[in-house]
UniProtKB/Swiss-Prot annotation:
Belongs to the prion family. It comes from Homo sapiens. SUPFAM superfamilies: Prion-like. Expressed in testis, in Sertoli cells, ejaculated spermatozoa and in seminal fluid (at protein level). This is Prion-like protein doppel. GO terms for biological process: acrosome reaction; intracellular copper ion homeostasis; protein homooligomerization. PANTHER family: DOPPEL PRION (PTHR15506), PRION-LIKE PROTEIN DOPPEL (PTHR15506:SF0). N-glycosylated. N-glycosylated at two distinct sites. One of its GO terms (cellular component) is extracellular region. The keyword Metal-binding applies.
Length: 176
């Protein structure tokens, strides 16, 4: 009986070691006061423009010139006007576990088109529209999901795998 109880204690210790107890934050005055830190904006201070900046498909314009081939005429136009074009896109379509690259790029392009309809419907400059479309396609195809890199590279280690491994070892030792 004593040997059987020692295995349960071992299982309890393993469960505590690999559980989420390390993620629990301690509460105290020291953790509440953050010296020399800027206060986070309250909900009243967050403007509609700030919310719109982070919507899916929103352009990121920082004035960087990207190395993308638009063809001879498109390259000249982009050289002269690169500061008017986006150099990034806010889009995170990686929430689905099995999303393919093609579905991800299509979703990114559709979200970008929906979020920036005014940019895409300027009828005055056809070359600007062509360069913008090519740029959006490139920016969306350059984005990636982390799990694409991990496919084929073995198992992803999650928090539950060490616990399952410990339980498997416990069952094996108990049966032995």
């Amino acid at each position: 009986m004593r040997k059987h109880l020692s295995w349960w204690w071992l299982a309890t210790v393993c469960m505590l070691l690999f559980s989420h107890l390390s993620a629990v934050q301690t509460r105290g005055i020291k953790h509440r006061i953050k010296w020399n830190r800027k206060a986070l904006p309250s909900t009243a201070q967050i403007t509609e423009a700030q919310v719109a900046e982070n919507r899916p498909g929103a352009f990121i314009k920082q004035g960087r010139k990207l190395d993308i081939d638009f063809g001879a005429e498109g390259n000249r136009y982009y050289e002269a006007n690169y500061w008017q074009f986006p150099d990034g896109i806010h889009y995170n379509g990686c929430s689905e576990a099995n999303v393919t690259k093609e579905a991800f790029v299509t979703g990114c392009i559709n979200a970008t088109q929906a979020a920036n309809q005014g940019e895409f419907q300027k009828p005055d400059n056809k070359l600007h529209q062509q360069v913008l479309w090519r740029l959006v396609q490139e920016l969306c195809s350059l984005k990636h999901c982390e799990f694409w890199l991990e496919r084929g590279a073995g198992l992803r280690v999650t928090m539950h795998q060490p616990v399952l491994l410990c339980l498997l070892a416990l069952i094996w030792l108990t049966v032995k």
